[in-house]
């Protein structure tokens, strides 16, 4: 969330699932805790608690069934509307001077197309990720022309480049996701939908 806010994002939707109620509480105002901290003179902690609840406009939607990242992204359709939007995988923490999602938003502004963060992974690990077919354009910019989610054989590996837990997508992805058949593990894979527009 802090990365998104640092990138200038003010409206944030967090897709959760069963057992994640504490996450919602974390970003909520906590008058009882604030009162306790104020009475005990812990002003530094009080300020931190107040800042957390005021970081951004944060909403939550529950993904009732674990049907994959594509299914989770599809849950955001009514929140997003027809605007481009950022996707930040919940299990990926990326640090840097310029937030990773800010860099992608800037590149989206330059190219006007969907943008994904890319990382190079070890050959022995590529089967755990999506493999991207890329063409180097300039500096650290690549054009992605194809992708394969979790390649199972060496022939399916397009390269050792994979998605780096961040992307900026156009709203057109929702219609594609609605028509994407479940893939690996019976899940709706975001990469399968993104492949349609690569």
Where are these regions (language model features)?
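Catalytic-core segments of class I nucleotidyltransferases/pyrophosphorylases
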Residues: 86, 105-109, 136-198
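Short loop/turn motifs at secondary-structure junctions
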Residues: 8-10, 81, 110, 143
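N-terminal glycine-rich phosphate-binding loop and ensuing alpha1 helix
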Residues: 1-38, 42, 79, 98-103
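Conserved beta-loop-beta/alpha segment of the NTase-like Rossmann-fold superfamily
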Residues: 33-35, 43-134, 178
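Small/polar loops that bind or transfer phosphate-bearing groups
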Residues: 14-15, 61, 165
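Alpha-helix/helix-capping structural signal
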Residues: 18, 92, 99, 171-172
